[in-house]
Every structure is written in C-alpha cells, then in structure tokens.
C-alpha cells in the first residue's frame, strides 16, 4: 500500500471522541487523507461541510468519522434514527454500511440499511430494533417514512454522498423531501460530498445546509495521476479478439470491463467465460442478491474480471483493481472518469485501456477535452490477435473453476504485439 496519498494530519491530533479514535486506530487508520484532513476539523466542530474529492480518496471515512463523533458527543435518548446517510445506488449504500461496521463494535451505535430490490424484511427488522444510523437510497427510505416505520424528527446528522450522481439519476426531489422531514439545517449537522461541486450541487447546499464551508481536493488531473491511460482504435471485428489478446498479455489480477449496453456486456461475458476466465456480469437486470454476491466474489478474489454497465460505475469501492477496460467509450464524458476511477485508488497505481471503435470513437474529443489531455494511442497488429475464440456462452453457468490460463498453459510474458 502506498502511503504518499496521505496527509501529515494524524487522527490522534484531532479532537475526536475517544471511542471513534479507538475504532480508527484499531483498523489501521493513523494519518488522514487530504479530504479527511480538510473536512474533519470543520465537521468535528459541528459545522456543515460541502466537500469535493475524487472517488477513492477517503470521503466515506471522512463523513462516517464525523457522524459517529457527533452522535457520541451529543447523546440523545430515543428509539428513532439519529443520522441519515443517503447514497445514489444500492451498492454504495451497502459499501458505506460495511465501512461503518469498523466503528459499530467500539462505539455501540447501530446501523441499518434501507434500499430497494430485496431484503425488505431483514431491513425492517434492523430498523425496528432501534438503529441509530440509517444508510440507504432515497426511494426505499421514503417508503419507510410514509409508512411511519422511520421517523426523521430526531435526526442530528444528514449525509449526502455522491451528490452529483444523485442529480444525474433524478433524485433531487427525493433528497429535498427527506431533508425537509428532518430538523431544520440549523438544528442538525449536514455533510455533502461530491466528485464535482457543480452549480446544482451548490444550490442544494445553499438551500438545505447551514452556511457550509466548501473544501476541495483538486486532483493533478481529473483521471488521477497514478492511472496509466492507453487507447486503441480497433475495427468492430477486431474488438473482441483485441480484448482477449490484451487480457492474455496484461494478465490483470483484478479488472473491470465496461460496455455501454446490457447486451454488449452479456456478449463480452459469454466470450470470456467460454475462454475459461473467472468472470462475473453486473448489469441493471441482475437481481440484487446476485449483485451483492458477485461483488463479494470479486472483492474476495473468487472472480478475476467483472463486466459491467455504468449502473456499477459509481459507488464500487473495491480495493486492488489493477485494470479497467473501456470496451466502449462512454457517451457521457464524466462516465469515463468515474469508470477508470475504479483503479488507481488510495495511492496505488492502475491501468486504463480504452477502445475507440467505429461506433463510439466520436465520443473521444469530448472526453479528452474534459480530462484536459490526450490519451496515449497504442498500435496493434491485426494479424497477431487471437482469433480462435471459443463459442460464447449464452446462459450463465455456475462459476467456472479456476482454469484461467493462457493458451500455452502458463502465465504469458509481457509482450505487446
């Protein structure tokens, strides 16, 4: 683990509640990341924060630390939730809850998830048991509020994570509905984090926060200076052979392949599964229980490759992703940054390989204008690509055994055509 992404600010030197500090130190947190170093002195003092930082920079622990500290420092006897953390996706909500578990044992505060898809009875049981902190997506939280299962009248902390993504997904009305069910901004601590502090996000902060302080951690470049970016211009008929060939040569330990449509993702998955790769498929049509299982398998190393649509581009907090492939260049230039931000996290390096094919090459100029630099172009020899591809699977079989090997039976040398 690289440490040069950390600041000189020690958690022990901040005015933290002793139980929160114990939880941090027992989990190996000694120094703050830049966003933590900037935001925590403000939020620990009880002041609202609107923070901008890239994904993978420690935003989650920044607001969790502040939330647990605030609740412990301002105890209230109630069976109602005292903190509300809103996220744009189920996966991000689950990840936040997972990270919060690091503090639950030491602090004694209880969390509960609230997201759509499945798990209704389990979620309801946790909420009715007296959760201090509700973590979830806006739609399911509103359902519980309207059914009088959750009361927001005792909320002391409101957190909005990935605020820009909330706007993109059309959740702004839900956010405002929930915020106005909570005590007024002056009676609560409100923390907002976003990859961009756009006009819309700042407007929300102005209307629903109490004179927030803005903190920004500007990256050296939008795509992260530890990510090596590479671009190929394949013909449509070369795309799949090129992907298979690059996987043979790069031999990524853990990679995510993004495509623009569910159909394309299924096609990629079929070819890779037939080729013996341990690969999972993550699209919007995959059932929630299966999605969580796939993410766990990928995180635990049971899967080496995840093929995903942009539904999974935001909110995936998976360590040690070495490679990201853009099989299709995204139509939205910001999605390029969100996609490749899955690698090169927490001070580690990463590789991003993109295909500018006949269908999506038109998206490249807008992407390069947005990230502020040209992506290095690599050439390939079409005659050297692997073309004897196995017939792709069409139905998802059980997880294949680990027979991931190259065509000579061993890990190949690093060789580029």
UniProtKB/Swiss-Prot annotation:
GO terms for biological process: RNA catabolic process. It catalyses: ATP + H2O = ADP + phosphate + H(+). InterPro entries: DEAD/DEAH_box_helicase_dom, DEAD_box_RNA_helicase, Helicase_ATP-bd, Helicase_C-like, P-loop_NTPase, RNA-helicase_DEAD-box_CS, RNA_helicase_ATP-dep_RhlB, RNA_helicase_DEAD_Q_motif. The keyword Repeat does not apply. It is found in: Cytoplasm. A motif (DEAD box) lies at residues 161-164. The keyword Glycoprotein does not apply. GO terms for molecular function: ATP binding; ATP hydrolysis activity; RNA binding; RNA helicase activity. Its EC number is 3.6.4.13. Its main location: cytoplasm. It comes from the Bacteria. One of its GO terms (cellular component) is cytosol. Residues 239-386 form the Helicase C-terminal domain. A motif (Q motif) lies at residues 9-37. It is an enzyme of class 3 (hydrolase). SMART domains: DEXDc (SM00487), HELICc (SM00490). Residues 404-417 have a biased composition (Basic residues). HAMAP family: DEAD_helicase_RhlB (MF_00661). Component of the RNA degradosome, which is a multiprotein complex involved in RNA processing and mRNA degradation. DEAD-box RNA helicase involved in RNA degradation. Has RNA-dependent ATPase activity and unwinds double-stranded RNA. Belongs to the DEAD box helicase family. RhlB subfamily. This is ATP-dependent RNA helicase RhlB. The lineage of its organism: Bacteria, Pseudomonadati, Pseudomonadota, Gammaproteobacteria, Pasteurellales. The gene is rhlB.
């Amino acid at each position: 683990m690289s440490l040069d992404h950390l600041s000189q600010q020690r958690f022990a030197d901040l005015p933290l509640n002793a139980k929160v500090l114990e939880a941090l130190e027992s989990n190996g947190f000694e120094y703050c990341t830049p966003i933590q170093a900037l935001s925590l002195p403000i939020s620990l003092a009880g002041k609202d924060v609107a923070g901008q930082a890239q994904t993978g920079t420690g935003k989650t622990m920044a607001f969790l630390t502040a939330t647990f500290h605030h609740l412990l420092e301002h105890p209230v006897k109630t069976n109602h939730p005292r903190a509300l953390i809103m996220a744009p996706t189920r996966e991000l909500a689950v990840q936040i809850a997972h990270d919060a578990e690091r503090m639950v044992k030491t602090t004694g505060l209880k969390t509960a998830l609230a997201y759509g898809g499945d798990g209704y009875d389990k979620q309801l049981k946790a909420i009715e048991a007296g959760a201090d902190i509700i973590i979830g997506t806006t739609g399911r939280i509103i359902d519980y509020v309207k059914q009088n299962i959750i009361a927001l009248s005792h909320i002391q902390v409101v957190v909005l994570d990935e605020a820009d993504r909330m706007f993109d997904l059309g959740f702004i009305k839900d956010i405002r509905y929930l915020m106005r069910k909570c005590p007024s901004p002056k009676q609560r601590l409100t923390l907002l984090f976003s990859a961009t502090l756009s006009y819309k996000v700042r407007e929300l902060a102005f209307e629903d926060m109490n004179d927030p302080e803005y903190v920004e951690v500007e990256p050296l470049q939008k795509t992260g200076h530890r990510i090596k970016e590479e671009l190929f211009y394949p013909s449509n008929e070369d795309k799949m052979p090129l992907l298979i060939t690059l996987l043979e040569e790069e031999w990524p330990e853990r990679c995510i392949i993004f495509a623009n449509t569910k159909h394309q993702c299924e096609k990629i998955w079929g070819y890779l599964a037939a080729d013996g790769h341990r690969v999972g498929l993550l699209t919007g049509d995959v059932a929630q229980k299966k999605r969580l299982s796939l993410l766990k398998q990928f995180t635990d190393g049971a899967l080496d490759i995840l093929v995903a649509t942009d539904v999974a581009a935001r909110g995936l907090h998976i360590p040690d992703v070495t490679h990201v492939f853009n099989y299709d260049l995204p139509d939205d230039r910001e999605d390029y940054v969100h996609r490749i931000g899955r690698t090169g996290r927490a001070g580690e390096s990463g590789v991003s390989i993109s295909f500018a094919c006949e269908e999506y090459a038109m998206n490249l100029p807008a992407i390069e204008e947005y990230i502020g630099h040209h992506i290095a172009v690599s050439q390939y020899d079409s005659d050297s690509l692997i073309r004897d591809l196995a017939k792709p699977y069409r139905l998802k079989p059980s997880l294949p055994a680990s027979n991931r090997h190259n065509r000579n039976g061993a890990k190949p040398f690093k060789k580029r055509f």
